[in-house]
Amino acid sequence: MLEFLRAYKSYDPAAKSLIEVFFLYPGPRALFIHRTAHFLYSIRLFFIARLLADISRTITGIEIHPGAQIGRRLVIDHGVGCVIGETAIIGDDCIIFHGVTLGGVKFDPVKRHPTIGNNVLIGTGAKVLGPITIGDRSKIGANSVVMKDLPPDSVIVAARSEILSKTIQ
C-alpha cells in the first residue's frame, strides 16, 4: 500500500504528505478498497466483493469492478467518473485521469475489456473499449475513443476543436 501512496506523492506536486494522499485523495482510497474487493472476488465471495466496490464508488466516484486486475503504482488522478470493467487488466506505473472508461462492447461472459500495458497514460474523458491491447508507454489523449489495438509507444489524440464562427447569431 505504501508503494502506491508514494507513487501519488511523487506524481502530484500538490500532495504534501502520504497521510494527505491516503485520506483526501479518492484514487488511493478506491485502489485500497479494490485490492480487498479483488481478493474477495478471487475466492468467489462475489456479493461481498461487489458490495465493497459499490461502497467505494459511492465514496470516491470511481467505479472499479472487483474482477479487474490492476498492476502496481496505478495513479488515478482526480478520478471522478472513471469506470474500469470486470475483465480489464492494467499494467504497472499507469496514470488514468478523470472520466476515463475502460469498458466492454459485448455482453458475453468472456474477455471484453481492454488490457493496458505498463507506463500508459490515459487522458481525461478517454474511452478505451473492447478486448483490445494498449501497448507499453502509450499515451491516449483527452476524449479519445480507442477501439483498436495500439502498439507500444503510440500516441493517439481526439480531433482538435476548431472555431467555426466568431460570432453567435
Descriptions of predicted regions:
Residues 109:
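Catalytic-pocket segment enriched in acidic/His residues
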